[in-house]
Amino acid sequence: MAKFTTWDGLELNYRVWEGKGVPVVLQHGIVADTNANWMSLGVVAALERAGHHVISLDARGHGRSDKPHDPARYSWQAMADDMRALFDHLGLERVAVVGYSMGGIIALLVAGADERVERLAIGGIGSGVVDCGGIDWRVIAAQDIVSAMSGDATAVKGLPGMFRVLADALGADREAIAAVAASLNEAPIQSLSGITVPALVLAGDADPLAAEPERLAAALPNAECVVVKGDHLAAVADPAFSKTLVDFLS
């Protein structure tokens, strides 16, 4: 594990697994971190077995990165800038970017702005990107995640309850997660037509946050869509998720 300093003074944690070829940069979803989203579910191991050079970033507010409680320290653009700053820090000239849920939106922003991105794989998001410009807040409101991070966990139901259970299981800083969620109630994706790199949309068949993933793939000029088994948390654990990702990146 290592850290670098952002433009606004935060220390962000990242991990590197050495390999060959174009580096694969991973960005996890809200509440999760490198271990929860990628290592424990077998994604990193699958990429390692295929010989890839893998890098994973803990987003601000998550994992081993700094976790300010001020919502003003978070935004979609800030987190996209964090990933691009990591490219700079490591001297990366070519990258493949993989993002899940919140990380998928970040990956789209980076791919649309940075010519170093040669391939893009996104999961845990679907038609909400097309219809809402980002996370599908028709399914879960940002304020619901904020509210879920405080009070009695047993009183939180549905998708907000899922995120609360995950936060408690990971020992996440719930006040920081609430600050993240409060800052992300916007539509950062204005257009997908400029993202012309080969892209893969991966979605769980029981994930309401990734509904109609084929519509997201159709909105990207050069994308394919693959549906695997599972809900928002379980889809990444389906062996087909890692296999499809490895095949796409190889």
Set out the residue ranges of the language-model regions.
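Conserved alpha/beta-hydrolase "nucleophile elbow" surrounding the catalytic nucleophile
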Residues: 28, 95, 99-101
